[in-house]
Amino acid sequence: MTTLHFSGFPRVGAFRELKFAQEKYWRKEISEQELLAVAKDLREKNWKHQAAANADFVAVGDFTFYDHILDLQVATGAIPARFGFDSQNLSLEQFFQLARGNKDQFAIEMTKWFDTNYHYLVPEFHADTEFKANAKHYVQQLQEAQALGLKAKPTVVGPLTFLWVGKEKGTVEFNRLSLLQKLLPVYVEILNALVEAGAEWIQIDEPALTVDLPKEWVEAYKDVYATLSKVSAKILLSTYFGSVAEHAALLKSLPVDGLHIDLVRAPEQLDAFADYDKVLSAGIIDGRNIWRANLNKVLETVEPLQAKLGDRLWISSSCSLLHTPFDLSVEEKLKANKPDLYSWLAFTLQKTQELRVLKAALNEGRDSVAEELAASQAAADSRANSSEIHRADVAKRLADLPANADQRKSPFADRIKAQQAWLNLPLLPTTNIGSFPQTTEIRQARAAFKKGELSAADYEAAMKKEIALVVEEQEKLDLDVLVHGEAERNDMVEYFGELLSGFAFTQYGWVQSYGSRCVKPPIIFGDVSRPEAMTVAWSTYAQSLTKRPMKGMLTGPVTILQWSFVRNDIPRSTVCKQIALALNDEVLDLEKAGIKVIQIDEPAIREGLPLKRADWDAYLNWAGESFRLSSAGCEDSTQIHTHMCYSEFNDILPAIAAMDADVITIETSRSDMELLTAFGEFKYPNDIGPGVYDIHSPRVPTEAEVEHLLRKAIEVVPVERLWVNPDCGLKTRGWKETLEQLQVMMNVTHKLRAELAK
């Protein structure tokens, strides 16, 4: 019989119950016991949903109050020593301080989990890091599930992935792989504690196998699993997010009891494991997207596998369901307004039922679930033929693009002369990245307008009042290129998604980004186009209030793609180019309306990089082409800006230069301008604006600090190509500190301009 198991479930609840309880606890509105009770209830509900899908094993150990990698840092005693906490007796309060910081220590750094939009807390390893086992987190959840009469499989991230996703810290140079011999016995202790608590199978996740691991890391798998296999539970080694076919010989030789492979992201890898002689777990339902599967098609893959493997075939989702929203059935508005689209979707609970149907079809024959299979086929057929998805005009526009459609009319050297002729900017021109503080009044007006409690005219008046204030304050500060402040925008992707065709939105489609922060990504379900102008009215109103140049503000095609649930029936590159052409319509309309400085934000270009470097060039080529398409056809005198914020540029600088924006602004203040050195060494050809202060903190920098950063920038970038700006948008800041911070920036700029003029 085929076995059905789960690897992980969303933690936050169907209606973000965990988020609201956490935040109440942080505000001291509920007790620790009340928070623990909410969490216990959510875990129980999750397990019951898995059991209702006829699962042979429910997942335990996947639930966390913040992040599963933070749980592992606690379980292995690897929490940062700088906090002075005892990992053996860590309170919940201290656990949250590790994640959020306290008055003495900054929070543990966060970064994206592989190529997902989930953030984990990065382990800090020192040459002298000592490990100590504390299996309480995993054992407690196992015992809770057992008390409900459920068969449970604990899930733990493996030792090599744990070390891989960490960072080396401290003054002594070392390779974190050298900590493995100290870490392994601690893992053995944790696994033994689970065996004692009654675990029959333990899942050990090693997604690091899907990236370009150095040879010595790959070699280490032999010793690690030779050691872990001595534990008297069966081990399922789980891989996901990509192919591990290149490691097939190694994986087949490891003394584990089973292997999980992701057949959604990498269906082609099945051939490499067809002769595997132990349990093979097939990840056949997408754990990262929201589309209903065509179950007949899935069965075409797994039925031959079952014939070959018999009882050794297990089935599951491709990875943990953490990355999908909880329950489609609560989306009543979507069901009423877009019934077809509703029928094409599957959230976590629907995916559990898809797996139930597949298990039944494999074990009892397709006839036992004929009705469910017919419904799945009908949804797939309707989606394949829908005129709402497939639009001839969009397809024709893409197909008819001439060669070099993504190129500006002239090279940068000519464009910058045409731009400076009318802009007439001083040395070290100043600007803002885009947004200004989103006050309570702005949020209330937007919410009231959405609920129908505020008329369109009153809403527009409220937004115009905010725009006028933003323009006035920038003029008082003597900024050179102004922004309108984006008061009308709730979110930089959602705002555009609501105005483009081919997008849809949910009410409760939340997924965890980190800790208590959840995001509700738009759904790109069909061909994308722009029915009418999206930003022109706001930007032209702002421009009417000032003689200084006003910057139009758009979110770039790659970022819109990366931060959405994307259709899976055509290549992502095609979707991205469709978005680019829709944005290009907006760019040309802004230009026509007299807005001749236009920013196209691309904070997510780096996030889209594939896990394997061999695939980078193809991605960077279409991502760069999409950006250029969005600004193509502009006059030379129109200045295109872009903004990016991340900590690593060196390896993709040629691709960033190839985007050919006239001005790029980047986040650099927290790295003391280190990032800029890469641009200098690369001889980045166009204008550049390194952030001179950190907007993520309410702290007002001193003039000396800003001057230090600006002088460092002048050493690296020719001063005639240097802009001055904050690190990022000011949406999350208060007005008081915003004005004080900008005043410091302007004072330093005026001082250095005077000095350079001598």
From Swiss-Prot:
Name used for this protein in its record: 5-methyltetrahydropteroyltriglutamate--homocysteine methyltransferase
Residues binding L-methionine, per UniProt: 433-435, 486, 601
Binding site residues for Zn(2+): 643, 645, 667, 728
Function: Catalyzes the transfer of a methyl group from 5-methyltetrahydrofolate to homocysteine resulting in methionine formation.
Pathway membership, UniProt: Amino-acid biosynthesis; L-methionine biosynthesis via de novo pathway; L-methionine from L-homocysteine (MetE route): step 1/1
A Gene Ontology BP annotation from the UniProt entry: methionine biosynthetic process
Cofactor note: Binds 1 zinc ion per subunit.
HAMAP family for the chain: Meth_synth
Residues that hold 5-methyltetrahydropteroyltri-L-glutamate according to the record: 16-19, 112, 517-518, 563, 607
Keyword Methyltransferase assigned: yes
Cofactor(s) required for function per UniProt: Zn(2+)
Family according to the record: Belongs to the vitamin-B12 independent methionine synthase family.
The entry's keywords: Amino-acid biosynthesis, Metal-binding, Methionine biosynthesis, Methyltransferase, Repeat, Transferase, Zinc
Record GO terms (molecular function): 5-methyltetrahydropteroyltriglutamate-homocysteine S-methyltransferase activity; zinc ion binding
A Pfam entry, by short name: Meth_synt_2
Catalytic activity, EC: 2.1.1.14
Residues the entry annotates as binding L-homocysteine: 433-435, 486, 601
InterPro entries xrefs: Cbl-indep_Met_Synth_N (IPR013215), Cobalamin-indep_Met_synthase (IPR006276), Met_Synth_C/arc (IPR002629), UROD/MetE-like_sf (IPR038071)
Reaction catalysis annotation: 5-methyltetrahydropteroyltri-L-glutamate + L-homocysteine = tetrahydropteroyltri-L-glutamate + L-methionine
The protein's enzyme class: transferase
Residue numbers annotated as active site: 696 (proton donor)
ATP-binding is among the record's keywords: no
